[in-house]
Amino acid sequence: MSSKTPLLDTIASPADTRGLSLAELKQLAAEVRAETIDAVSVTGGHLGAGLGVVELTVALHHVFETPKDIVIWDVGHQAYPHKILTGRRDRIRTLRQGGGLSGFTKRAESEYDPFGAAHAATSISAALGFCAARDAKGEDNSVIAVIGDGSLGAGMAYEAMNAATDTTKRLIVILNDNDMSIAPPVGGMSAYLANLVSGGAYRSVRKLGKTVVEKLPTPMREAARKAEEYARGMVTGGTFFEELGFYYIGPIDGHDMDALVSVLKNAKAFGDKPVLVHCVTQKGKGYAPAEGAADKLHAVVKFDVVTGQQQKAAGGPPSYTKVFAQELIKQAEKDDKIVAITAAMPSGTGLDLFGKAFPERTFDVGIAEQHAVTFAAGMAADGMKPFAAIYSTFLQRGYDQVVHDVAIQGLPVRFAMDRAGLVGADGPTHAGSFDIGFMGALPGMVLMAAADEVELARMVATAAEIDDRPSAFRYPRGEGLGLDMPAIAEPLEIGKGRIVREGTSVAIVSFGTRLSESLKAADLLAARGLSATVCDARFAKPLDLDLLLRLAREHEAIITVEEGSMGGFGAFVLQALAQHGALDRGLKIRTLCLPDVFQDQDKPDAMYAQAGLDAEGILRGALSAMGMDNVSAAGAGRRA
């Protein structure tokens, strides 16, 4: 291993950190930070968050006996230093690669990852579950949840904190405040106060005072309790957490190893109520290019360690995300009722561009998808035209609101479902696999999928005109095909697909961007003597029933293709054909969709090939339906 990390080279597991001095822990943190930077420069990934918690990670593994003591990282963006210290350093340069380490915590990967993560605000609830199980079994290990201040925008975190004191007396929550959105540290006095209020002497005096107070009449007793908590809250900023039943410590400098170790040891000794330790950290800490970047190099591709310069790909076609944003801006220029809503992802959804054009019509509600959906519903109910741009995977978090607050009331909220289908390096936690099924199940919903960037623009225009019911359109991560874009897109006719290529034997019906692979599959079929019709469905709801019945009459087989799970577009088509008797005449059908597994991270093309949704996979599906062996391209095949 590298001589640049002599101390880290001796660390095989967290147990090896427990005999280190404070000076050695500081050295170890510096080496872990260097290793994290070097590894992510090779793989790309989430850099800034991990750099901000290096000292905290080292201190946690030094003070607590992991994996016996449970440490749960919220989201998991910050877990790279944790992985380096927990026996995965030899694989750290496989982060987010096919067959490599996950970019998040993952139970199947290590005993030091007791709970998987990737979506925000789950850590405290999971930690409470571990506490309840521990208490029921009569065990005494510590349970720690590390959650960022951004995740506190999600209601689930407060639901868990509200239930904490009713669940257990032994829980540690560490608030990693890297935006100083709650309270900044106040120099040495802040660290001194944090250490003071977490120490045994202070708590003993406090306990004695409470004993005396209990002898007072009820009104005076309540007044004394409030006075003590608010007095402490004024100097520590923790009154809110105290009201939720936590003993608040902080804010402390999350890069001060001495303070971290001291306070964590004190917190470990608590046993009479949950503890919240407020650590203020700096995202991107210790790497100048990250500290100087507006986003603190939150997510990066491969980069030069010396300069921080990222190895951006040569300019290609605009991304689907950008196409969505640009068309939404065009529609908003002619309709002042159009507004846009994002849940803490303005850049990821392209709404940062919309926000520059229409700041007063752009709403970032934070990590709060449930609120985002019902907020949009309220705006729609009062005559506005809201577009809620939310990653498919995150829309899952607001599904009850989609059903109850939008669909049942028939409100015209427009859902722009970005990152639909497989997303590559972020793996199964971020894949947009299920939205076709869960959105298509809702009465009255108009559900579209773009085959290319021109189609996406037309779907934005279509959604803008739908005023009597909810609508949704899905589109993938990545670049479009480089097609010429119209000055302003024309809306589509609701529920009507299009024939892209006419054939006679097999009909391939694509929903989404698998259309290009479907056309390639048609070429492969032609080489085998089979003529294929290729259709872009455009709509999963309402289906183009006239088109589907025509295809059923005129072809021997129908193959549906979609970038989603089972129970989606193919299932809708199959049910519609069955209900109209189209299967009674021996029509052959195959529904090609994502496999019934959670696919691990890899390059998207490789993942779709594994799923059988590339041209070769579609070819195999068609040949299977026709009862033919998959022979060489030059052969005509034979009947099975």
Swiss-Prot record:
Positions that bind thiamine diphosphate: H77, A118, H119, A120, G150, S151, N178, Y287, E369
Assigned keywords, A-Z: Isoprene biosynthesis, Magnesium, Metal-binding, Thiamine biosynthesis, Thiamine pyrophosphate, Transferase
Self-association state and partner proteins as the record states: Homodimer.
Cofactor binding description: Binds 1 Mg(2+) ion per subunit.
Catalytic activity: D-glyceraldehyde 3-phosphate + pyruvate + H(+) = 1-deoxy-D-xylulose 5-phosphate + CO2
Stated role: Catalyzes the acyloin condensation reaction between C atoms 2 and 3 of pyruvate and glyceraldehyde 3-phosphate to yield 1-deoxy-D-xylulose-5-phosphate (DXP).
GO molecular function: 1-deoxy-D-xylulose-5-phosphate synthase activity; magnesium ion binding; thiamine pyrophosphate binding
EC numbers for this chain: 2.2.1.7
Record carries keyword Secreted: no
PROSITE patterns reported in the protein's UniProt record: TRANSKETOLASE_1, TRANSKETOLASE_2
Alphabetical list of InterPro entries matching this protein: Dxylulose-5-P_synthase, THDP-binding, Transketo_C/PFOR_II, Transketolase-like_Pyr-bd, Transketolase_BS, Transketolase_C, Transketolase_CS
Protein name: 1-deoxy-D-xylulose-5-phosphate synthase
Family as reported in the entry's similarity comment: Belongs to the transketolase family. DXPS subfamily.
Pathway terms, separated by semicolons: Metabolic intermediate biosynthesis; 1-deoxy-D-xylulose 5-phosphate biosynthesis; 1-deoxy-D-xylulose 5-phosphate from D-glyceraldehyde 3-phosphate and pyruvate: step 1/1
Pfam short name (any one): DXP_synthase_N
Protein's GO biological process: 1-deoxy-D-xylulose 5-phosphate biosynthetic process; glyceraldehyde-3-phosphate metabolic process; terpenoid biosynthetic process; thiamine biosynthetic process
SUPFAM superfamilies documented for this protein: Thiamin diphosphate-binding fold (THDP-binding) (SSF52518), TK C-terminal domain-like (SSF52922)
Sites where the protein binds Mg(2+): D149, N178
Cofactor(s) this protein cannot do without: Mg(2+); thiamine diphosphate
Gene coding for it: dxs
CDD domains on file: TPP_DXS (cd02007), TPP_PYR_DXS_TK_like (cd07033)
Cited NCBIfam families: dxs (TIGR00204), PRK05444.2-2 (NF003933)
